[in-house]
């Protein structure tokens, strides 16, 4: 499948945060999210840290800072009778359970559907938690695509899909991304790429295990654009890691203030 505004399309630069609707693609219009300018999270699940998402615009790879990468992770479900539709159905229904420990995905009650906004609370070095989110750009029976908001580690999207190759069902995750700002780019150079690869390797391993399969995850990495976009260095203002760190440092003060807020409500 393709995304509505590819990275080489000038429209992606002209309208940051706005996603082309399915009007140009009537055959599968119901599978595409409607046009949005900013994200909104109205009912955050209990336990989810809801910062760095509401009011943020969506960003394609064109709006990112770092080098542009396309990474493809796939695992053959050899020996399984699961069809691509079966794989995607299970992946959507159990998406958070396939992630590595200490990483949390708070999606909608109805699963993964076009236009949904999910909160992410991700583990970071030093026992910090990065709070960010994703937008469900596309979802059908055999694939679904997430797009990232301002402040996320990456500007871009990730597509999860399943297909049949040589009579074997394959599960795949493919990202097209840039680090969103210079701080994230340095982090990727200092081990972030390895951590990202390990994350999706573990996810696909967990998925294949769910189907009773033990196969090696295959990886293909291509640097699509080696240039860094210095005019996007200002993206650091939205850096969700920095904002999450500040939020965590303020936790003791919020706890101390909680009784006083409760008194005012009486």
What positions do the PLM features span?
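Short, intrinsically disordered, mixed-charge
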Residues: 89, 93-97, 151, 167, ...
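Hydrophobic-ligand binding "helix-grip"
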Residues: 125-166
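Hydrophobic ligand-binding cavity/cleft-lining segments
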Residues: 2-125, 240, 244-266
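Beta-strand/loop substructures that line and gate deep hydrophobic ligand-binding cavities in soluble
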Residues: 150-195
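A conserved amphipathic terminal alpha-helix motif
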Residues: 179-180, 186-224
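Short hydrophobic/aromatic-rich beta-strand segments that constitute the beta-sheet cores
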Residues: 120, 144-147, 171-173
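Short, surface-exposed beta-strand/loop "edge" segments at domain boundaries and coil↔beta transitions
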Residues: 82-83, 127-131, 181-184
């Amino acid at each position: 499948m393709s995304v509505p505004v590819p990275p080489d399309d000038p429209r992606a630069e002209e309208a940051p945060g706005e996603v082309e609707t399915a009007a140009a693609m009537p055959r599968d219009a119901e599978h595409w999210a409607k046009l949005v300018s900013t994200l909104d999270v109205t009912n955050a699940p209990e336990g989810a840290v809801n910062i760095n998402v509401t009011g943020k615009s969506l960003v394609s790879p064109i709006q990112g800072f770092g080098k542009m990468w396309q990474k493809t992770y796939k695992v053959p479900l050899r020996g399984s009778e699961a069809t691509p539709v079966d794989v995607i159905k299970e992946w959507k229904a159990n998406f958070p359970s396939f992630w590595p420990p200490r990483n949390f995905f708070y999606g909608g009650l109805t699963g993964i559907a076009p236009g949904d906004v999910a909160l992410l609370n991700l583990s970071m070095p030093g026992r910090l938690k990065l709070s960010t989110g994703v937008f469900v750009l596309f979802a059908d029976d055999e694939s679904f695509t997430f797009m990232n908001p301002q402040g996320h580690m990456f500007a871009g999207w990730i597509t999860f899909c399943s297909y049949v190759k040589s009579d074997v069902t394959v599960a795949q995750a493919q990202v097209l991304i840039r680090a969103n700002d210079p701080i994230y780019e340095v982090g990727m150079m200092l081990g972030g790429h390895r951590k990202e690869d390990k994350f999706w390797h573990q996810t696909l391993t967990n998925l294949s295990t769910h189907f009773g399969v033990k196969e090696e995850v295959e990886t293909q990495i291509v640097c699509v654009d080696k240039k860094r976009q210095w005019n996007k260095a200002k993206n650091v203002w939205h850096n969700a890691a920095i904002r999450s760190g500040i939020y965590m440092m303020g936790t003791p003060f919020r706890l101390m203030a909680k009784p006083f807020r409760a008194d005012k409500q009486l």
